[in-house]
Amino acid sequence: MENSNKVPISKIGLIMLMIFSTFFMSPHARRLEGGSNIDSQRLLHELMVDRIKQKRSRTDLEDKAVPGDRLSPGGPNHIHN
């Protein structure tokens, strides 16, 4: 009979351990008040600045008429080939 009493106590102990461990984990995953609004606005601003820089660099390349392929000035060197 003693063995049958130990099994439910160990199960109850394990369940209580799991419940109490959730109390210790909750402070680490909490959300701070007000911080998310500032971070989202800052992120949006940085993304817009990056997008403007990309548009400017594309238009600069198109205006300068830089060829897409790199060519050597004298053509291929026949000695090396």
From Swiss-Prot:
Is Disulfide bond set as a keyword in this record? no
Which residues does this entry mark as bearing Hydroxyproline? 73, 76
Q: List the signal peptide residues.
A: 1-31
Glycan-linked positions: 76
Record keywords: Glycoprotein included? yes
Q: What are the UniProt keywords, alphabetically?
A: Differentiation, Glycoprotein, Hydroxylation, Secreted, Signal
GO CC, any one term: extracellular region
Its GO biological process terms? cell differentiation
Q: Where is the composition biased (Basic and acidic residues)?
A: 55-67
Q: Where is this region: Disordered?
A: 55-81
Q: Which family does it belong to?
A: Belongs to the CLV3/ESR signal peptide family.
What is the protein named?
A: CLAVATA3/ESR (CLE)-related protein 12
Native organism is Medicago truncatula
At the highest ranks, the source species' classification is:
Eukaryota, Viridiplantae, Streptophyta, Embryophyta, Tracheophyta
Name the gene behind this protein.
Answer: CLE12
